[in-house]
From Swiss-Prot:
Organism: Homo sapiens (Human)
Function (record text): Meiosis-specific protein required for homologous recombination in meiosis I.
Keywords: Chromosome, Disease variant, Meiosis, Premature ovarian failure
Stored PANTHER family: SPERMATOGENESIS-ASSOCIATED PROTEIN 22 (PTHR35258:SF1)
Tissue: Highly expressed in adult testis.
Name of the molecule in the record: Spermatogenesis-associated protein 22
Record has Lyase as a keyword: no
Length: 363
């Protein structure tokens, strides 16, 4: 009875360990803020003989909640046997361990259940029973004291990582979700495609009909005709061409190429005065040696520039064979360089026009 009273009185004093007086040994005094010396031979360490936890969690609970201390004392005093002698520790180390244990007990341990992925359980102080194991002294005798689980073992149990099955289950759930979303997207796309196909059916039928009509035409003949035509006559450029010609050659090309539109360039001397006509027209006469050519210019978008009689002018336009009139779109005085190069241009144009007329007559 005396011993239990001493223990109860010691526990109520600021949460410190009960230290029997007959086990104390001489040691160096140190301030409370420092740790005990590791090399001191007078202090016995718990790692030599025992594998105890730093402190049971009920003492840390008493330090934090002193009101619940007497109730917990009556329950816990019967569980701890009196035969177990605890190793000696300094008061400062005990106080530090109490603070660490209070931090751990208040931290709210949480772990995942092995069977359920989403359920979380908070660790309670009363869910476990204290256990203690004597390693060196009692192991050979076969005498085991009351089982008390150490704080280190609790921490190891709590720090067990999640089994790989949990991660695999998560991956399978994600795959199922993505697969279901893909299936729903495919069904919606299938509906859209069906509606689009219904709307595109008549167009598709029309395209098939056109293909059938085109297939009925013999391909060999068309390919041969086009290839021969391309070989016989190849255009050097797709730009507008102006045929340089004298008055006599212009009339000749116009007579032999009546179905084509030809734009001629004529250099000749103004041989008459410019006279106004109906519909804002101006008429004049051009002479090239012995050949004369009546010309007309319509002042629709611009006025006719001033022309000087007896000078060489450059006239560009189309020759109307029925009316025997040259419809000009551009009239201006010719430069010296144009007069020098005009004969060479006429020869080149004659060669091209002769080749063109021959090809058109053969086809």
């Amino acid at each position: 009875m005396k011993r239990s009273l001493n223990e109860n009185s010691a526990r109520s004093t600021a949460g410190c360990l009960p230290v029997p007086l007959f086990n104390q040994k001489k040691r160096n005094r140190q301030p409370l803020t420092s740790n005990p010396l590791k090399d001191d031979s007078g202090i016995s360490t718990p790692s030599d003989n025992y594998d105890f936890p730093p402190l049971p969690t009920d003492w840390a609970w008493e330090a934090v909640n002193p009101e619940l201390a007497p109730v917990m004392k009556t329950v816990d005093t019967g569980q701890i046997p009196h035969s177990v002698s605890r190793p000696l520790r300094s008061q400062d180390s005990v106080f530090n361990s109490i603070q660490s244990n209070t931090g751990r007990s208040q931290g709210g341990w949480s772990y995942r259940d092995g069977n359920k992925n989403t359920s979380l359980k908070t660790w309670n102080k009363n869910d476990f029973k204290p256990q203690c194991k004597r390693t060196n002294l009692v192991a050979n005798d076969g005498k085991n004291s009351c089982p008390v689980s150490s704080g280190a073992q609790q921490q190891k149990q709590l720090r067990i990582p999640e089994p790989p099955n949990l991660s695999r289950n998560k991956e399978t759930e994600l795959l199922r979700q993505t697969h279901s979303s893909k299936i729903s997207g495919c069904t919606m796309r299938g509906l859209d495609k069906n509606s689009a196909l219904q709307t595109l059916k008549p167009n598709f039928q029309q395209n098939q009909y056109k293909k059938q009509m085109l297939d009925d035409i013999p391909e060999d003949n068309t390919l041969k005709e086009t290839s021969l035509y391309q070989l016989q006559f190849k255009e050097k450029a797709s730009s507008l061409r102006i045929i340089s010609a004298v008055i006599e050659s212009m009339k000749y090309w116009r007579e032999h190429a009546q179905k084509t539109v030809l734009l001629f360039e004529v250099l000749a001397v103004l041989d008459s005065a410019v006279t106004p006509g109906p519909y804002y027209s101006k008429t004049f006469l051009m002479r090239d040696g012995k050949n004369t050519l009546p010309c007309v210019f319509y002042e629709i978008d611009r006025e006719l520039p001033r022309l000087i009689r007896g000078r060489v002018h450059r006239c560009v336009g189309n020759y109307d064979q029925k009316k025997n009139i040259f419809q000009c779109v551009s009239v201006r005085p010719a430069s010296v360089s144009e007069q020098k190069t005009f004969q060479a241009f006429v020869k080149i144009a004659d060669v091209e026009m002769q080749y063109y007329i021959n090809v058109m007559n053969e086809t």
